[in-house]
Amino acid sequence: MGLKRAARQQRDIGKPAFDEEALVELTGKIDKTLPAVEQKIAGKRKRQNASDDGRGSKRRQTHPTEAEEHRDSHAAAKDKANRILLEEIIALGGDEKDLELVADVDSGNEGGGGPSQPKISSEQSLDQSFKDELAKFAASLGFHQFHNREDLNTEDEASPDEDAVGSTTDVSSDSDEGGGQEEMEKEDVDSFSDNEEKVTEKVDSGEAKIIPQDTKKGKQFRNLIIDPRPDWHAFPLDELPASRPDHPGKYSASIANLKSYAESLLEEDTANYQSAQAHSSTRKFMSTIMSSGTLSDKISALTLSIQESPLHNRKAFESLITLAGKKNRGQAIAALGALVDLLGNGAVLPDDRRLRPFGGQPALFGALQGSASQTWVAGQTLPGKLTKAHLVMWAYEDWLKAAYFRIIQLLEVWCSDEIEYSRSRALDFVFGLLKNKPEQEANLLRLLVNKLGDRERKIASRASYLLLQLLNVHPGMKGIVIGTVEQEVLLKPGQSLRTKYTAINTLNQTILSTREPSIADKLLRIYFDMFLALLKSGVLGNVGALNGDKRDGGTPRKKSNPSGSLTVGNEQDVAQKLVSALLTGVNRAIPFATTEDSTLEKHLDTLFRITHSSNFNTSIQALMLIQQLATSKQLAVDRFYRTLYESLLDPRLVTSSKHALYLNLIFRAMKNDADVRRVKAFVKRLIQILTLHQPSFTCGVLFLISELQKTFPDLRTLLDDPEEADDDGEEVYKDVCEDGTLDNVETQGVTSSFVSPATAYDGRKRDPEHSNAHRSCLWELTPLLSHYHPSVGIFARNLLSPQQSLPKPDLAHHTLMHFLDKFVYRNPKAEETKRGGSIMQPVLASGGTSRIVVSSKAAAKQQQSVNSASFWNLKPEQVLAEDVFFHEYFTRIGKPGKMTRKRDETKREFGSGDETGDEDEIWDALVKSKPDVEGPNVDDDSDADLGDFDYSDDEEDGSRTDGSMSDIGMDSDGFEGIFDDAGESDEQSSGEDEAPTKAKKGTATSGQKGRLSKKELKTLPTFASAEDYADILAAEDDGLDD
């Protein structure tokens, strides 16, 4: 048997391990062997039964009993299964005949009915189709690949089992009396079991070979000092004591030697890593991409290599830095983007600390101090507890710090590029590194701050936005950012006003807190220093100083103007914007500052000087700041009120665009004032200047005075109490004699109406307290009661005799533009969001609305359109005063169907008189809503004069020779139709019946006249006859009524 087994092994070695041929041969042997095995098993059973018969009677009695019990239980189980099967067949519509057909059929037998085969045959028989499918599946698995790689030890380990099986077979064959036939049968069975065991062993050996390949990949890096990992700085190292020596210079030689040795270790570790990766499929794929791939593919391959192990891929790092330094902008920007992703968002740089140079490692000095010798050279034992891993890590960290600095230098170059896109991308890269990592933050912050002075406003605004975003992410950097902006922009000579304006605009949006009063104090100091610098340079008042800074010789230095768009006027506007930004910053910083009152009082004089600048809007902001200081700190209160009182007469107030801001300032100042006489003087002057302003400002002032009456009820004395003269007594009159001497006569007890100058109102006083406004009356309110704007009249009458609480007026509702917009009937604009990019913007919109007396223009956009049905259906008492005319017009003739019919008929009857008819309708409605608009004593003579005026215009023009008398009559008689409208409203039914004939007559009259030449027009009489006027008027009125 050993020779046969060796022959089978030699035969199997030359064959595939588990292919289709082997499987077919295997299944064939199974088919041949199974019948012999069955006969053998049957013979054994017969011999066993014969031997059992020769034993004791007890043995012969028990076995039949157990067999009978087994047969009975098997029959009972079979009957139960047949009953269940019969129930299922009946449920499906069958009967007992169907049960007989399938009763003895095995569930695995597809050949039809018939008695079931023995159990051994049913379990081990294979269908031919299944064998074919199994052979194809085994061939697709590719197990034959592992035949050549099979380890011989596996067969050696399996040989004892085979020997055991063979010995057992020999023993059984020797004891068997069947001889050679049974021996051959057993040999065939052994061959089947051997083949089956070999297949199993080879499959197992293939799986065992796959697992060591994974472990082998980990074993490749056993020779490395530092394991490959993306976060190299998180590699576990033994902790070393850190110390700072008093004299680090004595260790310089040892540090230099250790650094050289560490660099050699890093090179060796990198070489080992590269050799371990040389034959990997990933490395081959990377090499293919680097040799034949596109630029983006190369950058991606380099990035992936660095991400696997930054410490062992310095060469890939250098390649990316080289690409970032190319002159090609596309390559450089793409490489810089990859580097920023690695260094900013990736794990290459530590998040919680900066990189240290090799000589700056604290643990290095601790190790050198613990060593016996002060000088270390290569070949000696490492000092202290230093290991090679420490040295490799420190050497790479030193190299990475230098490489990172080179990247920042490249970013600085691209931040100054000529192309705007390159500068914008480089700016974003700088922000990405500065936001995510603390390494080189001072240099990165300097680059970002310097872009506030970029020649393109878009880039400068972008830099300002990124700085604010940086402060939101890192609030602890406020002091650093403010100091850098001051040093690099505000105090740096040669910076333009536009750059300083952008810088101040960035600083005044810094989020302040009561927990950081030093930040607010620092900002206040910067703001006031800028105020003084602007005042000394004369930029605010001297236009000539805007041309440039003066040199020592006195000649102005030319400023660079890259865009060529900035002129002297533009620079002056920028200066005013700069002052406005400074005032905004002071307003926001004062509530959080802890500056002493003496320091603020020194700067108040600067603010008062700004109130007299050329821009009135800037003066308003300065007054707002002074008012805040005067209220909270009680500084220069009287001077503030004098300046505010004087600003009411400033002619620039009429054209200012900050009326709402100014009225709010007046309201807060008056409400916080404790002197009623001063408040009355302000009210008196406010009423006096209203005749110079537009209705919007007038309505705001009247509403402001009505609100002040709630705080100061004594203001009613200006309206209710008459003026009285303060006389010291009765005046004494003396007669003059003829000789010129005075004779004493009796005093006459007549009260004089003369008011002494000491008690009379004097509006020219600088101090409002001394103007004696409290002794006068508001006579200036009388013209406002009959103001041409209806809203002004309503507010004035309500102020004189309060009857109802009027809503807060919106200045934008009473402007001329808003009035004209009502005739356009356009859709309202979308509401603008109040929250912008700055977190400081919503303060005015949300928190400050409770103190605003007059709102902004936002509500004007939300007013409903006058040509909408919701406006037509309003009751007359619900309509605002300025909208009464529109409501009357659309209520009477604003229905769409009626207007269309009237226009069609008017076009048909009067031709081009459609536009004139519409104007007459509008004028009619206007006079209806306000009768006094036409004026008193309107008679026919005035109409005739108006007709003559129109006639003379036509005569001078000479181009309009078709001006028919009917059209002239319509224009001149439009006023008369208004007066007759009320009387004709009751007779509309009769007028409609007579309209067709009169219209025809009017049309015929117009057609008979035709076109008149200029000479014929001159010969026409000035006045027409009464009959002609009657016909024309009848035709006109009937046509309009239709």
Curated annotation (Swiss-Prot):
Compositionally biased region (Basic and acidic residues): 9-18, 63-79, 195-207, 902-911
Record Pfam families: CBF
Superkingdom classification of source: Eukaryota
Subcellular location: Nucleus, Nucleolus
GO CC terms, sorted: nucleolus
Keywords noted in UniProt: Nucleus, Ribosome biogenesis
Low complexity: compositionally biased ranges: 962-972
Function: Required for 60S ribosomal subunit synthesis.
Subunit-structure text: Interacts with NOC2. Forms a nucleolar complex with NOC2 that binds to 90S and 66S pre-ribosomes.
The protein, known as: Ribosome biogenesis protein NOC1
Species in which this protein is naturally found: Chaetomium thermophilum (strain DSM 1495 / CBS 144.50 / IMI 039719) (Thermochaetoides thermophila)
